[in-house]
């Protein structure tokens, strides 16, 4: 069992139960999955850009990503139907907790001029953040990077409200602006 999962079971769950006055421990929100998505604008011009992103995503997530394709053609973007436009990977279980642990303890401190993420969720208990550069991940070899590529990371939780979602992620160590940081155990 990963360090973050142990911390979630031992510290975070009881704290959330106490704060939101849940009667049953099964009502306490938890993480369901983490989705990492890279949209690749140059995919229509450069066919190798998709393969480069697949390789980088495999290194930083630990599993092979799915290539996403365009649902319909848009002539203004020179986009045809079924043309590859990005890659995504869904992490669950052990890999999810390992990724979040590395993200909080290694990647976030490497972000330049970082003051915390905004604490705005989507209203359904999910939180998405955007990164401008994949080079902040230690798994990526800087010599092999041909272009800087941003990504979106979505934390899908079983929380019913945004307040529960933000509190869960804060207790797991995600640094938010204007909120105290939960100290990692």
UniProtKB/Swiss-Prot annotation:
Gene Ontology biological process terms from the UniProt entry: translation
Signal peptide coordinates: none
GO cellular component: ribonucleoprotein complex; ribosome
UniProt keyword RNA-binding present: yes
Entry keywords, A to Z: Ribonucleoprotein, Ribosomal protein, RNA-binding, rRNA-binding, tRNA-binding
Cited InterPro entries: Ribosomal_uL5, Ribosomal_uL5_bac-type, Ribosomal_uL5_C, Ribosomal_uL5_CS, Ribosomal_uL5_dom_sf, Ribosomal_uL5_N
The UniProt record lists the keyword Hydrolase: no
Listed GO MF terms: rRNA binding; structural constituent of ribosome; tRNA binding
Domain of life assignment: Bacteria
Subunit organization: Part of the 50S ribosomal subunit; part of the 5S rRNA/L5/L18/L25 subcomplex. Contacts the 5S rRNA and the P site tRNA. Forms a bridge to the 30S subunit in the 70S ribosome.
Function: This is one of the proteins that bind and probably mediate the attachment of the 5S RNA into the large ribosomal subunit, where it forms part of the central protuberance. In the 70S ribosome it contacts protein S13 of the 30S subunit (bridge B1b), connecting the 2 subunits; this bridge is implicated in subunit movement. Contacts the P site tRNA; the 5S rRNA and some of its associated proteins might help stabilize positioning of ribosome-bound tRNAs.
NCBIfam families: PRK00010.1 (NF000585)
PANTHER family to which the protein is assigned, alphabetical: 60S RIBOSOMAL PROTEIN L11-RELATED
Membership in a protein family: Belongs to the universal ribosomal protein uL5 family.
Identification of the protein by name: Large ribosomal subunit protein uL5
